[in-house]
């Protein structure tokens, strides 16, 4: 009887969620949210949040390229480029660059400075509030990353001998369940954590960088208690000089549909056997409202199923 009640509750919640989605007014854009496109194609978005003056200033640069754009001979290039970037001063003097990275992460919610995936590379900076000087330096650094890196045998060797601060998405590309999901997908041969093949050819990395790191394939996002107009002007001044245009479309990452079957996966990552029920949900971060709705509905279903199983076990 209890299980029937929970199933009815889950069904009601799902129907309410669906009905609410249909009947709700369309979301209106936040008037504080500004966006634009520079003449070279770079897209920018700025959100001023004066109502949250103590929040840190979040800066993100997304480049629409990742390991899926690599050929077999280029394996590891997409991971190596941000490693090279993190060892250079990015148009700043050494003291400025050191200060930027010392203050450029949130100690309460730390993020990797760069995350490389199959189809994107994300540069992350979290700056203290009321530090317009640091924001200006951050934009200068990211503009340098976007098209002015120095890639030579010396800079490559220096990067490879330094600590690897670049993370991947998914975080563990060798994890058993993820490897199972990759079956039948082109992603299988394009691991974003793959190291460079030896011997390393810096000229080929430079050519890859110039081909895929083009401003028309980049999006810059700045959020915080900032002067939006001033930041927009600074973006135009700092990033407007970048050159290059994407001539080859980047491959689109896709996974095969998840089959309804039971599988056994062996791994050393857990000490106790684990029973999991997995949904065929998108693996990429949520970027649009339809994906958010699917996530909410799946989350309600998961919660109802958890209640039911917990009740049966107790």
Task: Name these PLM-found stretches.
Residues 97-100, 148-168, 227, 246-259, ...:
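Acidic/histidine-enriched alpha-helical segments
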Residues 58, 74-82, 94-102, 120, ...:
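Extracytoplasmic/secreted envelope proteins and their assembly/folding machinery
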Residues 28-33, 39-42, 52-62, 72-77, ...:
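Extracytoplasmic
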Residues 58-126, 172, 187-192, 303-314:
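M16/MPP (pitrilysin/insulinase) zinc-metallopeptidase core fold and M16-derived inactive scaffolds
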Residues 138, 166-215, 275, 279, ...:
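Scaffold signal of the M16-like zinc-metallopeptidase fold and its non-catalytic homologs
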Residues 87-91, 125-159, 312:
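M16/insulysin-pitrilysin zinc metalloprotease superfamily fold
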Residues 1-23:
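Gram-negative bacterial Sec-dependent N-terminal signal peptides
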Residues 188, 219-284:
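An aromatic/glycine/proline-enriched structural segment found at the starts
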């Amino acid at each position: 009887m209890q299980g029937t009640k929970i199933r009815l509750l889950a069904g009601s919640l799902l129907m309410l969620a669906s009905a609410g989605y249909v009947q709700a007014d369309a979301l209106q854009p936040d008037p504080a949210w500004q966006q634009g496109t520079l003449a070279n194609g770079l897209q920018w978005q700025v959100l001023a949040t004066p109502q949250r003056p103590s929040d840190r200033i979040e800066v993100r640069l997304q480049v629409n390229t990742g390991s899926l754009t690599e050929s077999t001979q280029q394996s590891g290039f997409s991971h190596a480029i941000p490693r090279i970037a993190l060892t250079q001063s990015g148009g700043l003097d050494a003291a400025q660059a050191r200060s930027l990275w010392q203050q450029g992460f949130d100690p309460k919610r730390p993020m990797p400075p760069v995350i490389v995936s199959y189809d994107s590379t994300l540069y992350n900076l979290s700056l203290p509030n009321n530090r317009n000087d640091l924001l200006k330096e951050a934009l200068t650094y990211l503009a340098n990353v976007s098209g002015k890196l120095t890639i030579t045998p010396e800079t490559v060797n220096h990067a490879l001998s330094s600590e690897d601060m670049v993370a991947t998405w998914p975080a563990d590309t060798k994890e058993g369940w993820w490897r199972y999901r990759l079956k039948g997908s082109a992603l299988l041969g394009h691991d974003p954590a793959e190291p460079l093949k030896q011997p390393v050819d810096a000229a080929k990395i430079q050519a890859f960088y110039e081909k895929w790191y083009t401003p028309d394939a980049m999006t810059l996002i700045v959020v915080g208690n900032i002067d939006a107009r001033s930041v927009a002007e600074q973006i135009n001044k700092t990033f407007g000089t970048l050159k290059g245009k994407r001539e080859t479309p980047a491959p689109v990452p896709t996974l095969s549909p998840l089959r309804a079957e039971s599988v056994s996966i062996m791994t050393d990552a857990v000490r106790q056997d684990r029973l999991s029920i997995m949904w065929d949900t998108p693996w990429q971060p949520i970027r649009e409202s339809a994906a958010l709705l699917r996530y909410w509905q799946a989350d309600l279903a998961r919660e109802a199923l958890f209640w039911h199983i917990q009740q049966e076990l107790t």
